[in-house]
Amino acid sequence: MIAQNMTIFFWGVCLLTSGWATYSEASVPENLDKSIDELKAYYIKDDHEIHNAHPVFLRVLKDLKVNLEEPEQNLLMSIIMDTYSRIFTRMENDSLDEATKERIAHVQEHLKKLRENYFPGKSAELKTYAETLWAIKEDDPVIQRKALFELKRVYREATLLKNLKNKERRRRQAKNTKNLKS
């Protein structure tokens, strides 16, 4: 359990310190940087598990800007922030060292402010919907029949969303073309 937490924590620290720091306007505040370094010193004793080529968040972040549009990027980042919050809450509850608990709370506070200021929205509501959908029992015959019964309506709704997105894209392209001619 502690080894898993250490791995998760390390990749989180990497995300906070190096991942975001690559953006010119992004940086880790000095007091947060110090807290992260102190937590790393406390939790990370052996780097072996950390460097096992299975990052927790970095693989998702790698393709974030390439594969997703801005609203999707913000939603995903909000979900990542929420995941960090849950990880650090668990670590704080499991810790017996008061100084470590305080450092974790300090990091949590910074993450909370970041999430509130830069990634507000309905991520909690969307996460609830996603969890509900992921919890569906695909092998349940009743669920299978209900899904089949609802498929045409769901398919129509998906098609409407796709068509709306295409119309908006064409509208933007037409506007850009018009602006270029002017």
UniProtKB/Swiss-Prot annotation:
Similarity comment: Belongs to the type II (or gamma) interferon family.
Species, as recorded: Carassius auratus (Goldfish)
Induction: Strongly up-regulated in kidney leukocytes in response to phytohaemagglutinin (PHA). Also up-regulated to a lesser extent by polyinosinic:polycytidylic acid (poly(I:C)).
Listed name of the protein: Interferon gamma 1
Keywords: Cytokine, Glycoprotein, Secreted, Signal
InterPro entries cross-referenced by the UniProt entry: 4_helix_cytokine-like_core (IPR009079), Interferon_gamma (IPR002069)
UniProt note on tissues of expression: Highly expressed in spleen. Also detected at lower levels in brain, gill, kidney, heart, intestine and muscle. In immune cell populations, has highest expression in peripheral blood leukocytes and splenocytes. Detected in kidney-derived monocytes, neutrophils, macrophages and leukocytes.
Assembly notes: Homodimer.
Subcellular localization(s) per the UniProt record: Secreted
Task of the protein: Cytokine which binds to interferon gamma receptor 1-like (ifngr1l). Has activating effects on primary macrophages and neutrophils. Induces nitric oxide production and phagocytic responses in macrophages. Primes macrophages and neutrophils for production of reactive oxygen intermediates (ROI). Stimulates phosphorylation and nuclear localization of the JAK/STAT signal transducer stat1. Promotes increased expression of a number of genes important for macrophage activity, including the interferon regulatory factors irf1, irf2, irf8 and irf9.
GO terms classed as biological process: immune response
UniProt keyword Signal present: yes
Signal peptide: 1-21
Sugar-modified residues: N93
